Amino acid sequence: LIYRLTHTNKVYFLSRPRRFGKSLLVSTLEAYFLGKKELFKGLAMESLEKEWNTYPVLHVDFSGSKYNSVDNLKAAINKQLLLWERVYGREEGDTTFSLRFESVIHRAYEQTGQQVVVLIDEYDSPMLDSNNDYETQKEIRNIMRDFFSPLKKSDPYLRFVFLTGISKFSQMSIFSELNNLQNISMRDDYSAICGITEQELRAQLQIDIEQMAQANNESYEEACVHLKQQYDGYHFSENCEDIYNPFSLFNAFAQKKYANFWFSTGTPTFLIDILQECDFDIRELDGTTATAEQFDAPSDRITDPLPVLYQSGYLTIKGYDPDFQIYTLTYPNKEVRKGFIESLMPAYVHLPARENTFYVVSFIKDLRVGKLDECLERLKSFFASIPNKLDNKK
């Protein structure tokens, strides 16, 4: 997949949930373009690539800071530009972010004789962090637009451009201006580029599964079933095979238990903000439908939680109707379903933690012993507490 990605087009965008391997993919691309052949020993890339050229790589990661103010974003961009300028130099007339970025690209090309590789990880973090403040987000959007603008003008100097994020902001100029940008987020041929497939799990992680089974007093196949129920089930295109959450899977192997690791890292605040602002019946989430156009977030304001819930990994594709081009969405696995009830739903409907714990624990206990009538009554009671419309002023 990496070889195909780097040899069939120049500019790509990939959307995946947090902690799903996007940064590892970016680091892999960086190692490849830096010519680090030794890191690919024994892999398909070692034999596929014949030249192993070294390119100048400009790698920026927007996930490392909080961008709830314009000053924070400006400081982060300035810091990154200074790091590049220490390597390639700076002209006195380079005063704006766009001029400085453009000059770095040009000088890197001139000094190395090779086209430049630009890797931008979590490009949308600044917009998502400022989603609850429209004026701040508007300023941040303009700064980001200015910063990204040299990528179009510098096309002859660029070998490869790769952007990752959670959401695709459809009206951001970077998506309309970049030459031949390919959005591979929902393409079948790249659906498994992040995450772990069933085949990879059984072929590469057999020892881990055996140790997991032994630690939990179960058979190998029972461990596989538990892992699949807990961490599998992600689909990123209509014909995508099942994908495991890599963060949860590797944490489960490390700790030898089936816990909710993905949710333990915290629910993104932007998602809670969006859920609290939107008029959306969360009882309809499991099995809801969406068109492909709905997966793009508008650049001015996110008002529909559905695409964000999908792109954030709380919902995944369950089915696809090619006649109407409609996707059916559902929770991917037990970890997400349980985590949603415990984490997102209380934030959405403002339930106190004590009351939330009571509902969840009682519901699970009744379900385990087969008290289906009691389960239904608890669900009715729980959903009755949810207002039909949220008060956005609260």
Predicted segments, located by residue:
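Phosphate-binding site recognition
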Residues: 1-394
